[in-house]
């Protein structure tokens, strides 16, 4: 199982981070060990002093593929959920200054959180999926799939030009504006529409 992630896929988030708007999708990966297993507590990692949440829509790959065309891409994923790409922002900033890869900041154990899956058969319009994140009952991120720079089909097709996609792979499709710091004791809740898909306490 592979975990693909898309960076800078919302204009407002790219701007809040001081990044240029990319000409093509920015792809990075997390290992399988990054996935926080169900019913497993999340602990604040000891190696960072600035842990940030990044709420994202996450796709589940349902069919093996390679070199997928945009117009066929929807056949390769079957469900969506909300998730968190946890980021050690202090480490990431240092790595970016040196032009180094981000794995230490983003790919560590349990840094990828996913909620309950919603089959696309229950989604009225994949280009109009509202989602958000609450921290301690206060909304901190809210966006919609219609604000993505690259939509689901473009992302799947683009990734498949470089990597095979396989059943069970996950794609974190990018975070909108509003990323921020979390500390021990914070409660994070991810939503699609009005449905709570995960609740997590930082321990």
Model-inferred region functions:
Residues 1-166, 170, 178-203:
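Catalytic-core "active-site belt" of small-molecule-metabolizing enzymes
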């Amino acid at each position: 199982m592979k975990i693909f992630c898309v960076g800078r896929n919302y204009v407002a988030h790219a701007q809040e981070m001081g990044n240029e708007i990319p000409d093509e999708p920015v792809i990075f990966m997390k290992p399988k060990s990054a996935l926080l297993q169900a019913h497993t507590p999340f602990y604040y990692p000891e190696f960072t002093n600035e842990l940030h949440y990044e709420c994202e829509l996450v796709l589940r790959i349902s069919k093996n593929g390679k070199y997928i065309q945009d117009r066929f891409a929807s056949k390769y994923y079957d469900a969506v959920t909300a998730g968190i790409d946890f980021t050690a922002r202090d480490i990431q900033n240092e790595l970016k200054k040196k032009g180094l890869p981000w794995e230490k900041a983003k790919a560590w154990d349990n840094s990828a959180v996913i909620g309950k899956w919603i089959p696309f058969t229950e989604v009225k319009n994949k280009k109009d999926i509202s989602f958000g994140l609450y921290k301690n009952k206060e909304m901190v991120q809210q966006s919609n799939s219609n604000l993505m720079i690259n939509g689901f089909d473009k992302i799947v097709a683009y990734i498949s030009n470089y990597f095979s996609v396989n059943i069970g792979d996950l794609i974190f499709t990018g975070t909108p504006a509003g990323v921020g710091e979390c500390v021990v004791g914070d409660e994070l809740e991810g939503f699609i529409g009005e449905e709570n898909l995960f609740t997590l306490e930082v321990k």
